[in-house]
Regions:
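Acyl-thioester C-C bond-transforming condensing/cleaving domain
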Residues: 2-28, 43-47, 54-170
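Thiamine diphosphate
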Residues: 40
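Short glycine-rich phosphate-binding loop at a beta-alpha junction
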Residues: 29-37
Length: 170
């Protein structure tokens, strides 16, 4: 795609700047934390990606940054973590989401180094990504790619209709 050559941090910084511009009543110093999920936090997506994005977006130094790694669900996990901190009263304003450019990181990361204390195959599910999980579900349960795509499309259609109907408003 058109963004394949663009670094993930460049994209993330622009998204955060755009978010701040869309909510002018939110002052940068009111942001308590920036939590970013990243499946492969290495190369330009590493070294505390959350703080890198916070600084790059112009948030002041006291705004902390955190990187969450839960592979494919990293972005969703960052939002869940932010929600928990706010509900617990530990923070008032947190920017959270996922940021990644998969075009820049080889599948599986740069160098795969499984735990040498385990015999390969002894812990088969530890290193399984969502892509492989989908393949296994398809093979084990006879679900075709077309069926998966149709399910995903219907799920998105239902979500869109629920949003239009106001079902996600508080």
């Amino acid at each position: 795609g058109g963004l394949a050559a663009t670094r993930g941090d460049q994209i993330g910084i622009q998204v955060i700047k755009g978010l701040m511009a869309r909510v002018p009543q939110l002052k940068p110093e009111d942001v308590d934390d920036l939590i970013v999920g990243c499946a492969f936090p290495e190369a330009e997506q590493g070294m505390n990606y959350g703080k890198v994005l916070a600084v790059g977006a112009g948030l002041p130094e006291p705004v902390s940054g955190m990187t969450v790694n839960r592979f494919c669900s990293s972005g969703v996990q960052s939002i869940a973590d932010a929600t928990a901190k706010i509900r617990a009263g530990w923070s008032d304003v947190i920017i959270a989401g996922g940021c990644e450019t998969m075009s820049h990181i080889p599948m599986g990361g740069s160098i795969f180094r499984p735990n040498p204390d385990w015999k390969f195959g002894e812990q088969p599910n530890v290193y399984v990504s969502m892509g492989i999980t989908a393949e296994n579900v398809a093979a084990n349960h006879g679900i075709s790619r077309e069926d998966m795509d149709a399910f995903g499309l219907e799920s998105n259609r239902r979500a869109f209709e629920a949003i239009k109907a106001g079902k996600f408003k508080e």
